[in-house]
């Protein structure tokens, strides 16, 4: 079907099938649509609300066009959020990725520059002297040797440059704001995915099933795209094609409720200082607790089922300073 027919289908309020969505997003990523067509398509999807098939198709097209990553023969995970929650916290998922890796898990973290905060994953890593532009082969080597690597979205999804000016001009959230966590080019075995809005938990969970995720958690934590300690966290667990919905509280992690204010971050350089202190075992208790809760859920994907025990193990590990050694090694690639 021609692009124009697919666009016409969207304009008339009809949904696209997964294969139709894949075809249309392939055209976008390969630069076959004008800015006006891309804008119209994104707004049509936004006004109606993209469904599971449309999101799955967009993910499929993104992965088909992504730069290849040498696939490992061992299980590994990603911990990544949509961003865009406007809360401007410290880089919790980036820190959790490094901590989990230094505890023996394998984490291929997909990330980008900041969406709405002052410091996205690649911003803070750059401030920490990590080269976010390593080749796929170098990233894979880091994953093999130290258990963690960073995949900079812009490097793997170069076709997204065709959408960038349109997104900038529209100044509103579009389907591209929710694609990021789902399009890790390493195609992880496990996923801990954070979403910026509670209504996205179900959409994301159903999309994860459509994408045949082996074992994933989707979380929204009282306004945050990660596990919260200032309120409840809504969770969807996706395993073997089935979804289970539940709520987690700070008590489930053996932790006390703490204010969201205590996790406020700043510019990349400031967040880098918080992160360094934390990995050296000298960080703020509230920062350590937030990272421990998120890392605890991440470790559950690797079979460590006791969240309270996981939290205690992470907190003890942070005090040891071993996680900082992992960060130092990451800067050598």
From Swiss-Prot:
Cofactor note as given: Binds 2 magnesium ions per monomer.
EC number assigned by the record: 2.4.2.18
Keyword presence, Transferase: yes
Catalytic activity: N-(5-phospho-beta-D-ribosyl)anthranilate + diphosphate = 5-phospho-alpha-D-ribose 1-diphosphate + anthranilate
InterPro entries according to UniProt: Anthranilate_Pribosyl_Tfrase, Glycosyl_Trfase_fam3, Glycosyl_Trfase_fam3_N_dom, Glycosyl_Trfase_fam3_N_dom_sf, Nuc_phospho_transferase
Metabolic or biological pathway, per its Swiss-Prot or TrEMBL entry: Amino-acid biosynthesis; L-tryptophan biosynthesis; L-tryptophan from chorismate: step 2/5
Sequence intervals crossing the membrane: none
Protein's name in the database: Anthranilate phosphoribosyltransferase
GO CC, one annotated term: cytosol
Binding annotation for Mg(2+) 1: 93, 226
GO molecular function terms noted in the UniProt entry: anthranilate phosphoribosyltransferase activity; magnesium ion binding
């Amino acid at each position: 079907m021609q692009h124009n027919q697919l666009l016409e289908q969207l304009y008339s309020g009809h949904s696209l099938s997964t294969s139709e969505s894949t075809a249309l997003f392939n055209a976008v990523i390969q630069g076959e649509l004008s800015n006006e067509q891309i804008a119209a398509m994104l707004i049509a999807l936004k006004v109606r609300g993209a469904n599971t098939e449309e999101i799955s198709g967009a993910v499929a097209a993104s992965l088909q066009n992504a730069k290849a990553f040498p696939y490992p023969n061992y299980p590994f995970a990603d911990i990544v959020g949509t961003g865009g929650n406007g809360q401007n916290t410290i880089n919790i998922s980036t820190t959790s990725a490094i901590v989990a890796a230094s505890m023996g898990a394998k984490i291929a973290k997909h990330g980008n520059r900041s969406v709405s905060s002052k410091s996205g994953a690649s911003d803070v890593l750059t401030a920490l002297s990590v080269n976010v532009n390593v080749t796929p082969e170098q990233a894979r080597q880091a994953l093999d040797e130290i258990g963690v690597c960073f995949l900079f979205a812009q490097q793997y999804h170069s076709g997204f440059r065709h959408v960038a000016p349109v997104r900038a001009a529209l100044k509103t959230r579009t389907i591209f704001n929710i694609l990021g966590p789902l399009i890790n080019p390493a195609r992880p075995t496990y996923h801990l995915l954070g979403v910026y809005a509670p209504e996205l938990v179900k959409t994301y969970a159903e999309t994860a099933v459509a994408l045949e995720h082996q074992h994933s958690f989707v979380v929204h934590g009282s306004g945050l795209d990660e596990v919260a300690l200032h309120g409840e966290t809504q969770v969807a667990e996706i395993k073997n094609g089935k979804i289970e919905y539940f709520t987690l509280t700070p008590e489930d992690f053996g932790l006390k409720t703490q204010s969201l204010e205590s996790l406020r971050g700043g510019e990349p350089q400031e967040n880098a200082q918080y992160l360094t202190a934390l990995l050296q075992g000298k960080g703020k208790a509230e920062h350590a607790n937030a990272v421990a809760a998120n890392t605890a859920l991440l470790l559950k994907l690797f079979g460590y089922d006791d969240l309270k025990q996981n939290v205690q193990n992470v907190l003890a590990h942070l005090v040891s300073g071993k996680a900082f050694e992992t960060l130092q090694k990451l800067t050598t690639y």
